[in-house]
Amino acid sequence: MATLHVDVVSAEEAIFTGEAKFVVLPGEAGELGILPGHTPLISRIRPGTVKIVRADEGEENIFVAGGILEVQPGSVTVLADTAIRAADLDEARAVAAREKAEEALRNAKDKADIAVVEAELAMLAAQAVAARKLRQGRTH
């Protein structure tokens, strides 16, 4: 069966590099499913889970906090703002951080501070949802 070369990279590190049968991820306009031979595409990515079905039938789940996707017929590159392997997600920690960010939002004075905290809240909410879904055995 044909495969895709997949790279998931954050600003800090390469999270995944390998061959995959398909990739599912949260595109700007909705969920995207990428198979080998897909039409070239560039899209923004929403916060959520990137599901990679490896060539060996194993599965990788990676939370991304947003970023850019590039698709070529034989490759997928995810340039994520932040990327965390599913095994490293902690729902309780994400919920606690979200509560702290909500408090910061209540205390924010100017529009720039509010925008930064709102972006962080959106990312933390998506992270908590992704952690909950992965804990329940669902990825999408």
From Swiss-Prot:
Membrane topology value: Peripheral membrane protein
Signal sequence coordinates: none
Name the record gives this protein: ATP synthase epsilon chain
Function per UniProt: Produces ATP from ADP in the presence of a proton gradient across the membrane.
Any one Gene Ontology molecular-function term assigned to this protein's record: proton-transporting ATP synthase activity, rotational mechanism
Taxonomic lineage from the root: Bacteria, Pseudomonadati, Pseudomonadota, Betaproteobacteria, Burkholderiales
Organism for this UniProt entry: Bordetella pertussis (strain Tohama I / ATCC BAA-589 / NCTC 13251)
CDD domains to which the protein is assigned, alphabetical: F1-ATPase_delta
Keywords of the record: ATP synthesis, Cell inner membrane, Cell membrane, CF(1), Hydrogen ion transport, Ion transport, Membrane, Transport
SUPFAM superfamilies in the cross-refs: Epsilon subunit of F1F0-ATP synthase C-terminal domain, Epsilon subunit of F1F0-ATP synthase N-terminal domain
